């Protein structure tokens, strides 16, 4: 299938609107991607004509909704090449998925004196849950340091592992720098030391194929809203043997087998024992539509288009005076930058006046900001619906801001 950005853009209603009297150039998909009409329509259709509470319902609507929900679980398992759909837990997003692992697997397997390894480039969602776990049990949090070019100091990694290392929690792709970490060698090293590996895939799954079996990671988590799906839904993959051993971390309906005031409660089997309460069924349906949409386009086609666009953007940005870029030359999805000594908020505000949407701030990565000794950065993210013309508008906008502000 030939990739056509014009055809893709036609599927996204919001891209036809104007901001401040100018066509919207949406360069903030790494924060949250826009939704194609196919996703919007699928979720709306479910609420119009198919909504019902899932599980245990004897009536037709409930049975159909349950079947649709479980079909999306199967669809998502194929999307990341899991061995079984029952290795996938529906969560609210990447943050909840990581917290689930920290509170279920972590509480059961990490003890005083143990250690967990993360990196200096992690999103707060892959830092704070491990800090909280370590504080609870008296474990140590170890950190892989950064290089100035935005890659990790991988030569230090072997020195961080020891017989007390229980987990390596690492991002697949940095949400600020676009760095893609060499997961295969990192996972192999962790397993050689008897440690498990959790991968934060929030910034990876929309850019290229992910094969959890080939990676051999123990946990992989991602959100739907960055993958052109709805908010409030994500996927946590856990190797089956691990998932079966993990206790639930939330109690309520749907996750029990029996409840007795005198005998206590027994849990249903995984993955359903991790899905307490009424699920976000509409979001799950929308996620299924997003997976179908991206799969039909072909992730290899998307990756090729986006990489060409990234190379073009990096080359064009070289023409902007006093522009500092952060991250390696080879990157996925995002370009973080600052313009002279101007605060990122000021630059972002000017760009918004030009109809260009970028993200500004610390990007939930304060340790990374501290490493580069800046309070904030601007971040432009490139998605499959962005164009060379939008890149040109960004470059022209930055040049204009430089002339105005000096």
Swiss-Prot record:
InterPro entries: Aminotrans_V_dom (IPR000192), Aminotrans_V_PyrdxlP_BS (IPR020578), Cys_dSase_SufS (IPR010970), PyrdxlP-dep_Trfase (IPR015424), PyrdxlP-dep_Trfase_major (IPR015421), PyrdxlP-dep_Trfase_small (IPR015422). Transmembrane segments: none annotated. Gene3D superfamilies: Aspartate Aminotransferase, domain 1, Type I PLP-dependent aspartate aminotransferase-like (Major domain). Keywords: Cytoplasm, Lyase, Pyridoxal phosphate, Transferase. It catalyses: (sulfur carrier)-H + L-cysteine = (sulfur carrier)-SH + L-alanine; L-selenocysteine + AH2 = hydrogenselenide + L-alanine + A + H(+). One of its GO terms (biological process) is cysteine metabolic process. One of its GO terms (molecular function) is cysteine desulfurase activity. SUPFAM superfamilies: PLP-dependent transferases (SSF53383). Pathway: Cofactor biosynthesis; iron-sulfur cluster biosynthesis. Its main location: cytoplasm. Its EC number is 2.8.1.7, 4.4.1.16. Its cofactor is pyridoxal 5'-phosphate. GO terms for cellular component: cytoplasm. The active site is at 364 (cysteine persulfide intermediate). The modification N6-(pyridoxal phosphate)lysine is found at residue 226. It is found in: Cytoplasm. PROSITE patterns: AA_TRANSFER_CLASS_5. Pfam families: Aminotran_5. Homodimer. Interacts with SufE and the SufBCD complex composed of SufB, SufC and SufD. The interaction with SufE is required to mediate the direct transfer of the sulfur atom from the S-sulfanylcysteine. Belongs to the class-V pyridoxal-phosphate-dependent aminotransferase family. Csd subfamily. NCBIfam families: PRK09295.1, sufS. Cysteine desulfurases mobilize the sulfur from L-cysteine to yield L-alanine, an essential step in sulfur metabolism for biosynthesis of a variety of sulfur-containing biomolecules. Component of the suf operon, which is activated and required under specific conditions such as oxidative stress and iron limitation. Acts as a potent selenocysteine lyase in vitro, that mobilizes selenium from L-selenocysteine. Selenocysteine lyase activity is however unsure in vivo. This is Cysteine desulfurase. It comes from Escherichia coli O9:H4 (strain HS). The lineage of its organism: Bacteria, Pseudomonadati, Pseudomonadota, Gammaproteobacteria, Enterobacterales.
């Amino acid at each position: 299938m030939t990739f056509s950005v014009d055809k893709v853009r036609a599927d996204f209603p919001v891209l036809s609107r104007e901001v401040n009297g100018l066509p919207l150039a949406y360069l903030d998909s790494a924060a949250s991607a826009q939704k194609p009409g196919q996703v919007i329509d699928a979720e709306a259709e479910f609420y119009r004509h198919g909504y019902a509470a899932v599980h245990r319902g004897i009536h037709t609507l409930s049975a159909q909704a349950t079947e649709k929900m479980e079909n999306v679980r199967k669809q998502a398992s194929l999307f990341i090449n899991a061995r079984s759909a029952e290795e996938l837990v529906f969560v609210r997003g990447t943050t909840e998925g990581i917290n689930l692992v920290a509170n279920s697997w972590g509480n059961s397997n990490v003890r005083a004196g143990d250690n967990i390894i993360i990196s200096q480039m992690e999103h707060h969602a892959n830092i704070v849950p491990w800090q909280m776990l370590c504080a609870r049990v008296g474990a140590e949090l170890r950190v892989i340091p950064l290089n100035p070019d935005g890659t990790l100091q991988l030569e230090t990694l072997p020195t961080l592992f020891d017989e007390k290392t229980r987990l390596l929690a690492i991002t697949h792709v940095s949400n600020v720098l676009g760095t893609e970490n060499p997961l295969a060698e990192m996972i192999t090293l962790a397993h050689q030391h008897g440690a498990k590996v959790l991968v934060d895939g929030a910034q990876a799954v929309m850019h290229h194929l992910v094969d959890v079996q080939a990676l051999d990671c123990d946990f992989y988590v991602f959100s739907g809203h960055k993958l052109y799906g709805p908010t409030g839904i994500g996927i946590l993959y856990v190797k089956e043997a691990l998932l079966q051993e993990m206790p639930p971390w939330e109690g309520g309906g749907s996750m029990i087998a029996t409840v007795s005031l005198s005998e206590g409660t027994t849990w249903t089997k995984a993955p359903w024992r991790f899905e307490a309460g009424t699920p976000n069924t509409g979001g799950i349906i929308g996620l299924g539509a997003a997976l179908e949409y991206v799969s039909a386009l072909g992730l290899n086609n998307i990756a090729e288009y986006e990489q060409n666009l990234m190379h073009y953007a990096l080359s064009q940005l070289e023409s902007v005076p006093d522009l500092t870029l952060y991250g390696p030359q080879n990157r996925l999805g995002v370009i973080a930058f600052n313009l002279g000594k101007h605060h990122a908020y000021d630059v972002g505000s000017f760009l918004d006046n030009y109809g260009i949407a970028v993200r500004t701030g610390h990007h939930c990565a304060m340790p990374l900001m501290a490493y580069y000794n800046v309070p904030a950065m601007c971040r432009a993210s490139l998605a499959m619906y962005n164009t060379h013309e939008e890149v040109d508008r960004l470059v022209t906008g930055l040049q204009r801001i430089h002339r105005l502000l000096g």
